[in-house]
């Protein structure tokens, strides 16, 4: 059970970082 929780937590963190990077890149391109 803890393994599944940590796995989902890792996926959540990875998706959050990826979306943040994509938003940052798009903002830089807009400027």
Swiss-Prot record:
Any single biological process term in GO: photosynthesis
Q: Where in the cell is it found?
A: Plastid, Chloroplast thylakoid membrane
Membrane topology according to the record:
Single-pass membrane protein
Instruction: Name one cellular component (GO) term.
Output: chloroplast thylakoid membrane
Q: Which UniProt keywords apply?
A: Chloroplast, Electron transport, Membrane, Photosynthesis, Plastid, Thylakoid, Transmembrane, Transmembrane helix, Transport
Molecular function terms, GO-annotated: electron transporter, transferring electrons within cytochrome b6/f complex of photosystem II activity
| Residues passing through the membrane, by range | 4-26
- Main localization of the protein described in the UniProt heading: plastid
**What is the annotated signal peptide range for this record?**
none
| Family to which the UniProt record says this protein belongs | Belongs to the PetL family.
Q: How does it assemble?
A: The 4 large subunits of the cytochrome b6-f complex are cytochrome b6, subunit IV (17 kDa polypeptide, PetD), cytochrome f and the Rieske protein, while the 4 small subunits are PetG, PetL, PetM and PetN. The complex functions as a dimer.
Free-text function comment from the UniProt entry: Component of the cytochrome b6-f complex, which mediates electron transfer between photosystem II (PSII) and photosystem I (PSI), cyclic electron flow around PSI, and state transitions. PetL is important for photoautotrophic growth as well as for electron transfer efficiency and stability of the cytochrome b6-f complex.
The name of this protein is Cytochrome b6-f complex subunit 6
């Amino acid at each position: 059970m803890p393994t599944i929780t940590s796995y989902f937590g890792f996926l959540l963190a990875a998706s959050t970082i990826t979306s943040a990077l994509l938003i940052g890149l798009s903002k830089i391109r807009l400027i």
